[in-house]
Amino acid sequence: MVVSEKSKILIIGGTGYIGKYLVETSAKSGHPTFVLIRESTLVNPEKSKLIDTFKSYGVTLLFGDISNQESLLKAIKQVDVVISTVGGQQFADQVNIIKAIKEAGNIKRFLPSEFGFDVDHAHAIEPAASLFALKVKIRRMIEAEGIPYTYVICNWFADFFLPNLGQLEAKTPPRDKVVIFGDGNPKAIYVKEEDIATYTMKAVDDPRTLNKTLHMRPPANILSFNEIVSLWEEKIGKTLEKLYLSEEDILHIVQEGPMPLRVNLAICHSVFVNGDSANFEIQPSTGVEATELYPKVKYTTVDEYYNKFV
């Protein structure tokens, strides 16, 4: 039996929030792993420590920039798969990655910077709508150019939402009162960052995910806001005072509040008022579900996640 070699993977945005998990999992999964970084990143104290960790995993560092076509092309020619995890300010710059992939002609799969909600099914308000529209534009461009792809939809990052249960500015889950977005009934989906990386790396060489959207929908983690609050109340043996933030209240804050808060609340409106995270069926012609493809992966449930906070 011939064992196929694991693909060589380039991660662009590898020192970012979700990127670092993908770099670690890629390297530990046996993929020859490359990370495109700017030389200026080496002098950033926080990032330089992360880069030392990457080196300890055997990761190859390639100096370059998403806006420097020459460095991008040189990096892409060395690998089989390109994964982009760039942040919102660089979503549009992924056009450069697409151009370089087309010119290089050797890429078996491109995973653009998705790792959130399915923008083809979301009904977001501004300022989130513009960010989602950029992702949609990149998707259509990839498809038009005939580049092999996988779009990774992980919904909420568990570590982003669950530690404070969506309570702005808080560091731990509430123990007295909780603010709930909308009526708290629409379902949303939460996935631990390490699990996101595990499912993603299983998908990169899987023919079943080629030219498909990979949806992460761990059954135990499809919960409404009210269900998460109830779960937390059971853990601490206490009933919390509940304050419901109406759609009208959310829209007012989105219009009047400071910028980072406006984006986050606009996304919360999409997820918790519209239910855009889980209110549609996955179409087999365009999408697959991670826990069905990889049933042996033991994912962290929301229930387990909260044990460390009790």
From Swiss-Prot:
Pfam families: NmrA. GO terms for molecular function: oxidoreductase activity. Keywords: Alkaloid metabolism, Cytoplasm, NADP, Oxidoreductase. InterPro entries: NAD(P)-bd_dom_sf (IPR036291), NmrA-like (IPR008030), NmrA-type/Isoflavone_red_sf (IPR050608), PCBER-like (IPR045312). It is found in: Cytoplasm. One of its GO terms (biological process) is nicotine biosynthetic process. Expressed in roots. Pathway: Alkaloid biosynthesis; nicotine biosynthesis. Transmembrane segments: none annotated. Belongs to the NmrA-type oxidoreductase family. Isoflavone reductase subfamily. PANTHER family: ISOFLAVONE REDUCTASE HOMOLOG A622, PINORESINOL REDUCTASE-RELATED. Root cells silencing A622L exhibit inhibition of cell growth, severely decreased formation of several alkaloids, and accumulation of nicotinic acid beta-N-glucoside and N-methylpyrrolinium cation. Involved in the biosynthesis of pyridine alkaloid natural products, leading mainly to the production of anabasine, anatabine, nicotine and nornicotine, effective deterrents against herbivores with antiparasitic and pesticide properties (neurotoxins); nornicotine serves as the precursor in the synthesis of the carcinogen compound N'-nitrosonornicotine (NNN). Reductase that may be involved in a late step of tobacco alkaloid biosynthesis. Maybe involved in either the formation of a nicotinic acid-derived precursor or the final condensation reaction of tobacco alkaloids. This is Isoflavone reductase homolog A622-like. The gene is A622L.
